[in-house]
Amino acid sequence: MAMMEVQGGPSLGQTCVLIVIFTVLLQSLCVAVTYVYFTNELKQMQDKYSKSGIACFLKEDDSYWDPNDEESMNSPCWQVKWQLRQLVRKMILRTSEETISTVQEKQQNISPLVRERGPQRVAAHITGTRGRSNTLSSPNSKNEKALGRKINSWESSRSGHSFLSNLHLRNGELVIHEKGFYYIYSQTYFRFQEEIKENTKNDKQMVQYIYKYTSYPDPILLMKSARNSCWSKDAEYGLYSIYQGGIFELKENDRIFVSVTNEHLIDMDHEASFFGAFLVG
């Protein structure tokens, strides 16, 4: 009878298994409930702070914020506003300092250069040099293929009316630095004085030439102006000046010069004999 009761009830092993299963299920339920609870709380806190921050920027919260009030200082919205204001102020100050520093550097570096150099121009005006023995080229010079005698010496310093800007003078020739169309001009002054004999025809032919040198070996004639003059035998002096000018296309390293006939009649006064060119386009 006793043996039948023992065989009809649950064994000790089965009871232990049931207890373990129940314990595991209970722990799992507790963990799940705890997880759900804390997740819900975190979500509510996030929503609260998110809405509070958005309300600060959207001006949904119209309450007054006193910076000296501890309760206001502990408010999340007040902290957000204060931090944002400080950040904006720092960015504005930094940008202003960088802008002012950059402008000052540019003014210090560029302005003196601009003041010294001034506007960039391409022009030259050179005048006669009275009293120089080597004013004209010798007959056997390399300019023998050019008509007349080349004027070698011109005054190019700024002491008088002369100047050179982005052009330079070499052996009586203006050397071009920049290609373009140039207005070229020249005037030469002729002075005739000698004893006149009767039955002697007093006439002179005066010619002024303007040439250019290119990569081609021979000079190229650009302009010439001529006059036959017969001065009165009763005149103490015979005076005449020839002027000519025109626009020509010149290239870099081209050279232009002036030559004349009757070179012994040339008066190289700096106000009467001159030569020049300037870029027009």
UniProtKB/Swiss-Prot annotation:
The entry's localization annotation reads: Cell membrane; Secreted
The residue ranges for the Cytoplasmic side of the membrane come to: 1-17
What tissues has this protein been observed in?
A: Widespread; most predominant in spleen, lung and prostate.
Q: What topology does it adopt in the membrane?
A: Single-pass type II membrane protein
Q: Which UniProt keywords apply?
A: Apoptosis, Cell membrane, Cytokine, Membrane, Metal-binding, Phosphoprotein, Secreted, Signal-anchor, Transmembrane, Transmembrane helix, Zinc
Q: Does the keyword Cell inner membrane apply?
A: no
Give TM segment ranges.
Answer: 18-38
Gene Ontology CC terms = extracellular exosome; extracellular region; extracellular space; plasma membrane
Indicate the segments forming the THD domain, all copies. 122-280
PTM note: Tyrosine phosphorylated by PKDCC/VLK.
Which first-to-last residue range defines the signal peptide?
none
* GO molecular function per UniProt: cytokine activity; identical protein binding; signaling receptor binding; TRAIL binding; tumor necrosis factor receptor binding; zinc ion binding
Q: Which SUPFAM superfamilies match?
A: TNF-like
Ranges of Polar residues compositional bias? 130-141
Q: Which residues bind Zn(2+)?
A: 230
Report the InterPro entries cross-referenced here: TNF_CS, TNF_dom, TNF_ligand_10/11, Tumour_necrosis_fac-like_dom
The similarity annotation says: Belongs to the tumor necrosis factor family.
Q: What does this protein do?
A: Cytokine that binds to TNFRSF10A/TRAILR1, TNFRSF10B/TRAILR2, TNFRSF10C/TRAILR3, TNFRSF10D/TRAILR4 and possibly also to TNFRSF11B/OPG. Induces apoptosis. Its activity may be modulated by binding to the decoy receptors TNFRSF10C/TRAILR3, TNFRSF10D/TRAILR4 and TNFRSF11B/OPG that cannot induce apoptosis.
What PANTHER family is this protein classified in? TUMOR NECROSIS FACTOR FAMILY MEMBER (PTHR11471), TUMOR NECROSIS FACTOR LIGAND SUPERFAMILY MEMBER 10 (PTHR11471:SF27)
Q: How does it assemble?
A: Homotrimer. One TNFSF10 homotrimer interacts with three TNFSF10A mononers. One TNFSF10 homotrimer interacts with three TNFSF10B mononers.
Record-given protein name: Tumor necrosis factor ligand superfamily member 10
Question: Could you tell me which species this protein originates from?
Answer: Homo sapiens
Taxonomic lineage from the root: Eukaryota, Metazoa, Chordata, Craniata, Vertebrata
| Gene it is expressed from | TNFSF10
